[in-house]
Amino acid sequence: MYKLDTPSLLFESSRPGRATAIFPGSDVPARPLEAMIPAKQLAPSPPPLPELSELDVVRHYTNLSTSNMSIDANFYPLGSCTMKYNPKRNERLAALPGLTAQHPYQDEGTLQGLLALLHELQEFLAEIAGLDAVSLQPAAGAQGELTALLVAGAYFRDRRESRTKVLIPDSAHGTNPASAHLAGFEAVTIKSDARGLVDLADFKAKLDDKVAAFMITNPNTVGLFDPQVGEIARRLHDRGALLYLDGANMNAILGAVRPGDMGADLMHYNPHKTFSGPHGGGGPGAGPIAVRQALAPYLPAPLVARDDDGTYRLDYDRPRSIGRVRSFFGNTGVLFRAYCYIRSQGPDGLKAVAQHAVLNANYLMTLVRDVCPVPFGERCMHEFVASARSLARDRGIRAMDIGKRLIDHNIHAPTVYFPLIVPEALMIEPTETEGRETLEIFAKVLRAIAEEDPAALHDAPHSTPISRPDEVKAAKTPVLKWNGTPENR
């Protein structure tokens, strides 16, 4: 049987003389490049670009696109990432010429519509957070973390307080300690207890007058709401420290509880997880931060302000601001999508988002926990962490094998081996946009995988052009450009 396979690289499809278009002959006499461009500015030889027809190029990229997994085509239970479906109307609205044709160097008087939208978004995000002021500048969730910690640092410097430490749970996202370090703090780890919650005894032992903040994700990364958050906030405030809430899991509590009401003093949002910003692709992104009034003077300048006459302006008169963290107004395209999502859902809709996210996660957990036990909690919030430890011990089937084999069933793998406090972790987050039927199919597939021949699973996926690349080698010795040598192929 012969099968027409598309070569993996355009360079391998190249044929001399092949072209995407044939142009008519020119009646302008040809001149050598050397006669028009100084020799020192010319390359010694033409670039080795592939020679292809238009069909070759279109077919190549179409085949690549069908090899990708996406939320539009596949169930995508990638825990801690909230890979929910983003309404296409928000994409259409974000492409309106009235938005895309504007330029940040325009006079503010010609940007009143955009500034009004951004000002209203600031107010929406402040209300959802239960906090007082918002900056839209940060360009990603991680930069939002860093910005908020820089704000905290400026606040304590203004108070002449030398605070050098940030407390971080051992189940936290890796960006938390990285952001603390970049902001000039020492990251101090707080252990989890047997329930998967903050070990309060360890927290109390490490809380002192050098602590600037405690970074808590609530619900946390094992999918549990930590009811100790009120006591944690009280103890921090008694010591003059701040409670930082990582907003990565806001999808679980929208409209049900506000971080400010839990005692949080500052937080960041991830619009790509909660408010229909695009996922991945290297950006652009957004990571707005919300803070209490005492921290508001230190927010990045400018903020969008509304004057008494109803006009909007950029407020640069902020002498205690930490300064800019992003050019212009932030990534307005992503912020506009967030605005559209919040507007279209309304308060009741946002609460329903959280309710359905929690319902779906709990339903799916009950379907799979006898195959892959869930070590923490009888119930969960928006996600849960199952463990393939028993399968690995008894049958040699590891979390990675399960994740890879799911791809053969057109299901994206869950997050594996995170958080580190769960051995053979499978972090599963179905989100609110999936139907019951999808969850039940996932559970059936997981059960089938658990009964398969382990030797066959070790080579999965079997349906992809490449099964298991050497990920360690790729991380240690990445090849970032093609040069035609065999090891690059």
What are these regions (language model features)?
Residues 139, 193, 217-219, 387-391, ...:
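Short strand-loop junctions, especially beta-strand C-caps/beta-turns
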Residues 132-138, 165-168:
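A short, small-residue-rich loop immediately preceding and capping a beta-strand
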Residues 1-133, 257, 307-329, 335, ...:
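Non-catalytic terminal extensions of PLP-dependent enzymes
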Residues 113, 143-309, 396-397, 424:
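Conserved PLP-enzyme active-site core in the AAT-like
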Residues 78, 140, 245:
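Single, functionally critical "micro-switch" positions that shape active/binding sites
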Residues 135, 188-190, 414:
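General small-molecule cofactor/ligand-binding pocket signal
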Residues 154, 158, 182, 209, ...:
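Short, well-ordered loop/turn and helix-capping segments at boundaries between secondary-structure elements
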